[in-house]
Amino acid sequence: MILRGMEDSKSAQKRFEAAVKVIRSLPEDGSYDLSDDMLVLFYSYYKQATEGPCNTLKPNSWDPIGKAKWEAWKDLGNMSKDQAMTEYVQEIQLIIETLPVTDRMAELLDALDPFYEIVEDDDDDDDEGVSKAAPLFTGSTNADKDAERDEEVESESKEGNLDDYMELVEKQKDLSSTTGEKGSLLVFNRSEENSISSLTDGTHSSLNTVDDEEELVYDGSDDEMDSDSMDKPATPEKGSGVRSVRLADGSVVGANMQHGGNREPQCGSQDGKPQGLISPVPHPPTLGTVRNDRISACSGRERGCQGDGGQRGETADRMDKQAINTQITTILSELEDNMQDVLRRLTTLEQLTASQAEISPSKTWHSDKPKKRLSWWPLNSSPFTAVLTVLWPFAVHWLVQFYLQRRRRR
């Protein structure tokens, strides 16, 4: 038991050392880049496996990376070194499939030989020379084989259904071409339609585009035959009731009154054969006249049916246009009245302004009376100005002297 425990610890240490070498050998700009959380987790397991429980001081707050590493290491508590090594190897096993195979990876795979093997990829060896490590599962190979076998059987059944469907499509096209030459309507087989719908329901989603194209072909053929049926007469059904009118010359006009549908009444022959609007009679001139009359009568009924709705629509449109024209006329008349009122007010204002200008006297800033001038005074200035000019120096001198005397007395 002791020897087995030592062997287990040695194998765990060997795997741990190989895993550490793989992590350290990863390139910084490689195809797979470890996240920060994964790096912190590997760091905590590595420190726990190499140094034991965390007993160091907590880093400063300005070192968030060191703080995260310390907290992850501290959270492991008293985990043993062997358990930390095992956890480290288990974490790297989760991402080993995404790592490139190198020499360090080969050492790790040798240590994990009971669980993994190297699978060489021939296509990648020519370009990169690097292969991936894939896990071996004993039960997965049988499941893959069963899945592949089921896919092959399903694909074969789908191909067979598609072939049957294409044959039905070709038959339908041939049938439509032959019936079109004979001038009769295309009768769609309901059983074939059901079989085609069942086949399309069972096919794979990748065949949807083919089914859509074939459905468009059927829709196009149906539309063509519907348009032909409007121009050509339909075959009269048994028991539908055929009214015949015998003319004076012996010709017969048949009107097929069909019930239970949305189609217009069709003209048919008396003998029930699809031979046009009128059955052939031995009088060609009269036949042509009757055919033209019948066609004109049918077209007249259609125009009459369409004309009722058209006249109603035209009457409603005409009434709407008349109402709009009436509103526009009313608005224009009101606008004209408002403009005339504004012009009338402007004319009155101009007249009032002109009358006020005529009544008010004009103001002048100049005095009407001229200044009186002394005849005996020779100067242009007044005598008072001249006396003041002569006496003001004496007055100033006297004031200065008086001020000085008062100052001396003090």
Curated annotation (Swiss-Prot):
This is Acyl-CoA-binding domain-containing protein 5-B. One of its GO terms (cellular component) is peroxisome. Residues 326-355 form a coiled coil. It is a single-pass membrane protein. Residues 119-165, 221-242, 254-320 are annotated as: Disordered. It comes from Danio rerio. PROSITE patterns: ACB_1, ACB_2. Binds medium- and long-chain acyl-CoA esters. PANTHER family: ACYL-COA-BINDING DOMAIN-CONTAINING PROTEIN 5, ACYL-COA-BINDING PROTEIN, ACBP. Keywords: Coiled coil, Lipid-binding, Membrane, Transmembrane, Transmembrane helix, Transport. The keyword Coiled coil applies. InterPro entries: Acyl-CoA-binding_prot_CS, Acyl-CoA-binding_protein, Acyl-CoA-binding_sf, FERM/acyl-CoA-bd_prot_sf. It is found in: Membrane. The chain crosses the membrane at residues 382-404. The keyword Transport applies. It holds the Pfam family ACBP. An acyl-CoA binds at residues 23-32, 43-47, 69, 88. The lineage of its organism: Eukaryota, Metazoa, Chordata, Craniata, Vertebrata. GO terms for biological process: fatty acid metabolic process. GO terms for molecular function: fatty-acyl-CoA binding. Residues 12-101 form the ACB domain. Residues 119-128 have a biased composition (Acidic residues).
